[in-house]
Amino acid sequence: QMIGEKTTCVLINTPNNPTGVVYSAQTLTRMADILTEKSKAFGHNIFLVSDEPYRDIAFDGKKVPYPAAFYPHTLTCFSYSKSLSLPGERLGYVAVRPGCEGEDILVDMMAQISRFTGHNCPPSIIQRAVGRCQEVTSDLSVYETNMNLLYDKLTALGFEVERPGGTFYIFPKA
């Protein structure tokens, strides 16, 4: 209902900050169907921007589905600062799904936006280090251990809490 004729993109975050919700394949399929339907109705594609800095922090062995696998007009944003435990480092990428309408223009436009808004390249040493760590992750199990401890304590105190499926956030009902 909130997607109107002027809607050009929808932004999602999975696993979600601050709730820790991980969107299921079923949810992403339904979202893709709605975006496809609305795109046809309005005569223009609606892009899906998927913000995925917490992709590698999922609990209970849960696999986080790739939203780009469900919808062709997806831009994926990723940050290494979470998966490699590099707090404060702003190093990541934006990927345009191959075949996405206007993919060449989008890539050029993102490069220009990055320059105009003052985003600078991270230090060379960080770029080189991350380049060599593509198949490596930090021990992220500490986040699940901490989440379980905090979840158990909060619920024992009577707080209503949705058990997070990922991230290092927990969102008690106020």
Question: Residue spans of the language-model regions?
Answer:
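Active-site pre-lysine segment of PLP-dependent enzymes
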Residues: 2-6, 18-89, 98, 104
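Short SAM/SAH-binding signature in class I
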Residues: 8-10
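Short, histidine-centered active-site or binding-site loop motifs used for metal coordination
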Residues: 13-16, 114, 134, 174
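Short, well-ordered beta-to-alpha junction loops that form the rim of enzyme active sites
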Residues: 15, 52-53, 166-167
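Catalytic cores of transferase enzymes with a strong primary signal for eukaryotic protein kinases
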Residues: 55, 62, 142, 146-150, ...
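Conserved core segment of the aminotransferase class I/II
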Residues: 72-144, 148-152, 157-159
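Short beta-strand
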Residues: 160-165
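Conserved PLP-binding active-site segment of the aspartate aminotransferase-like
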Residues: 168-174
